[in-house]
Amino acid sequence: MKATKTTYKKDPMGLTPSQIVNELNRFIVGQEKAKKAVAIALRNRCRRKRVEGNLRNEIVPKNILMIGSTGVGKTEIARRLAKLTNSPFYKIEATKFTEVGYVGRDVESIMRDLVEIAVNTEKTLAKTKVDINAREKAIERILDSLVGKTSSSETREKFKEKILNGELDDTEIEISVADTTPVGSGSFEIPGMPGASMGVLNLGDMIGRALGSSKTKTKKMLVKDAMAIIIPEESEKLIDQEKIIQQAINLAENDGIVFIDEIDKIASTGSSGAKNAEISREGVQRDLLPLIEGTTVNTKYGPVKTDHILFIASGAFHIAKPSDLLPELQGRLPIRVELNSLTKDDMIKILLEPETSLIKQYSALIGTEDVCLEFAASAIEKIADYAITVNLEVEDIGARRLHTILENLLEDISFEASEMKGKKITIDDKFVENQLSKIITNLDLAKFVL
């Protein structure tokens, strides 16, 4: 049965755990244990906000460790959960970090990036609220350039109507806009730490904002281009930057979700001959401890507490085991969820059931060329069969195998679709076999192609 969007009865605490699972079912097949775990974690956040007194601060999230091979839905569950709640979401691979003092990024950059995401989210939301006013002010500025500030109200009204109707889109005007030319560098890379940068405060910008002024530049441009530049400018003036930053920090602290992938790669396996690597991995784990347990990280927007951020760690754990992580880190990830490897039935459901399934995506893409693309049930079964076979024989990459198989299967159709307007193409099991059987039977070739 296909998952469909449901309208729920209003709950003062947001979605219930069962409703959260139903929402995740719209996009993700199976993995009920993992869905249940994240649904409970999310609901507990809402419950905590309703607890009164000092006890509220003592209630911390129960962080989650997801165990499962690649392509089974670990990242997608976390990402969809964040979208469902409009929470700031940040995904990072644990292998990108090294302990402080070594080459690599320091773990505190997680919080800096999460807050940046929260600020952008809040800023976008604030701009939508002032969009109408910003548009009005932008039109007034363009009218000043078109007909002059001293023109009569009748003239301005007449030209305003033309702007709104798009009649003056290609008219060139000369107008003053904010000078966005960078002076010097806004940030610099920290030596010995690739990918890590430190923001530099621009005193000129700060003083300009404080005095209500900023550098402008007169440019010649079309009316439609001027609108695209001036509306964001006017939006910036209308929104309260300080309030946005406060709201963003609060959003990151109380609703932020951090997904740390490949955590098994920093586990100490105890293998001989890799002592230095073991020390480095253990160092990263020790650096992660205070972040997950709860600490304060300084960002360019101000200090951010990590006490109530939900951390979801994941890994395949093919070589290392969860018990190879530092005992202290294991204690910070109390909820363990094992995700199942995908079966043939799962693959069939993944192809058909989600609202954004691959079959629907490819049909929509080819449909833009006025070509009707349909898949017979026998073809879906054959594709799932081949996906499982290659995963078993080559390497198990889960549902991601379907992407490579479908790309190879539909390569010729995608290439020729623009010359097949008005046609209907039905993919059946014979078509799938003709296109893929040679590759599937030749495992050496399958390793490179699929």
From Swiss-Prot:
Its main location: cytoplasm. GO terms for cellular component: HslUV protease complex. Keywords: ATP-binding, Chaperone, Cytoplasm, Nucleotide-binding, Stress response. Pfam families: AAA_2 (PF07724), MCM (PF00493). GO terms for molecular function: ATP binding; ATP hydrolysis activity; DNA binding; peptidase activity; proteasome-activating activity. ATP binds at residues 29, 71-76, 261, 328, 400. It is found in: Cytoplasm. One of its GO terms (biological process) is protein unfolding. Belongs to the ClpX chaperone family. HslU subfamily. ATPase subunit of a proteasome-like degradation complex; this subunit has chaperone activity. The binding of ATP and its subsequent hydrolysis by HslU are essential for unfolding of protein substrates subsequently hydrolyzed by HslV. HslU recognizes the N-terminal part of its protein substrates and unfolds these before they are guided to HslV for hydrolysis. A double ring-shaped homohexamer of HslV is capped on each side by a ring-shaped HslU homohexamer. The assembly of the HslU/HslV complex is dependent on binding of ATP. This is ATP-dependent protease ATPase subunit HslU. It comes from Rickettsia massiliae (strain Mtu5). The gene is hslU.
